[in-house]
Design a protein with these regions (language model features):
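Active-site phosphate-binding strand-loop segment of PLP-dependent enzymes
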Residues: 110, 121-177
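Conserved active-site segment immediately N-terminal to the catalytic lysine
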Residues: 170, 184-195
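Conserved PLP-anchoring active-site segment centered on the Schiff-base-forming lysine
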Residues: 88-102
Length: 362
């Protein structure tokens, strides 16, 4: 088989340099004669690792000093519950902006804990697009406003930050965290599962403004209580140390290659190259409006489910893995997160051209 490129939506590709580093010291971390998986999470060396990981992340993402960084577990789904348990206060309700599957799922979970209002901000006509993002006239009625800036299933991304006035803005950035620089100060909470751009599954990143910590409802489990986790250095329980270690290597690698300035340019080039080919093709079609096309998850169809299935099977056989679209929409999806090189996109386009030449209806 030729070189394999992994287009999985998550768990996703990890930088080869990171995997090689981990492989090289897997059984002898820091010349201790043991693996990082075997050392105490409260030992000197691991405590130094997590301190450096946070320092590197803060530098790469330009996180202000009045924000706390937590490394938790439970994935984004865990945060779907943790957010309302920690942030619902005197107003007693929150606003959820529905742009697709994951934002709707977050709202559904939050309803177990609070009164939730939901506004659909996506139009699914001939093209899928995001509607108006100005909620400053109503946001002060809510304890927070929640949205998902990148919907992996539909391939829809929201590039502008919603206007919520002085209200607390919460963002599920699981699929576009660290893909470009953002102004952290516009958000009250940012959370993300690790398995797309941060590292392997098992770690959940939470970036939260200091003043939002300490208001959890009394029945909040300690594992979901942000104040408890802050005071315990994100280690109220034994954390997934190997996943944390790999995330630390990713943060360090991002610094070494030039940070998010470089990553932003790389990601824009990858996405534009692929979308330009799709738009020029007579076989493939993307149904998302250009201004809302995801940089991370590129969806496309042939219009024939049988041909889509053939595409997935044949692409897999030549080392282009995990291109099958989500079961909700079908078709194909190329997830091109930070670790995907431009060469992977070029290899995909080369296959797409060959497949089109062989299968375009005459």
């Amino acid at each position: 088989m030729s070189q394999v490129f992994n287009f999985s939506a998550g768990p996703a590709m990890i930088f080869p340099e990171v995997l090689q580093k981990a492989q090289g010291e897997l059984t002898n971390w820091l010349n201790q004669g043991v693996s990082v998986m075997e050392v105490s999470h409260r030992g000197k060396y691991f405590m130094e690792l997590i301190a450096q990981a946070e320092k590197d992340l803060r530098e790469v993402y330009n996180i202000p000093d009045n924000y706390r960084v937590l490394f938790l577990q439970g994935g984004a789904r865990g945060q779907f519950a943790a957010i309302p348990m920690n942030l619902i206060g005197k107003k007693g309700r929150a606003l959820y902006l529905n742009s697709g599957h994951w934002s709707a799922t977050a709202a559904k979970e939050a309803r177990n804990f609070a009164e939730i209002d939901e506004i659909t901000i996506v139009e699914n006509g001939e093209q899928t697009r995001i509607t108006d993002l100005d909620f400053s006239h109503i946001a002060d009625q809510y304890d927070y406003v929640h949205y998902c800036p990148n919907e992996t299933i539909s391939g829809v991304e929201i590039f502008d930050v919603p206007n919520v006035g002085d209200a607390v803005l919460v963002a599920d950035m699981s699929s576009n965290i660290l893909s470009r620089q953002i102004d952290i100060s516009k958000f009250g909470v940012i959370y993300a599962g690790a398995q797309k751009n941060l590292g392997p599954a098992g770690i959940t990143l939470v970036i939260i403004r200091d003043d939002l910590i300490g208001n959890a409802r009394k029945e909040t489990p300690s594992i979901w209580n942000y104040a408890t986790q802050r005071d315990a250095d994100s280690m109220i329980n034994t954390p997934p140390t190997f996943a944390w270690y790999l995330c630390s290597l990713v943060f360090k690698h991002l610094k070494e290659i030039g940070g998010l300035e470089v990553i932003t340019k790389r990601n824009a080039l990858k996405a534009q190259t692929l979308y330009d080919y799709i738009d020029s093709s007579k076989l493939y079609r993307n149904v998302v409006a250009k201004e809302n096309r995801s940089t991370m998850n590129v969806t496309f169809i042939t219009g024939n489910p049988e041909l889509d299935a053939k595409f997935v099977a044949e692409s897999t056989s030549v080392g282009l893995q995990a291109l099958k679209g989500h079961k909700v929409l079908g078709g194909m999806r190329a997830s091109i997160y930070n670790a995907m090189p431009q060469e992977g996109v070029e290899a995909l386009i080369s296959f797409m051209k060959k497949f089109e030449a062989e299968n375009l209806p005459q």
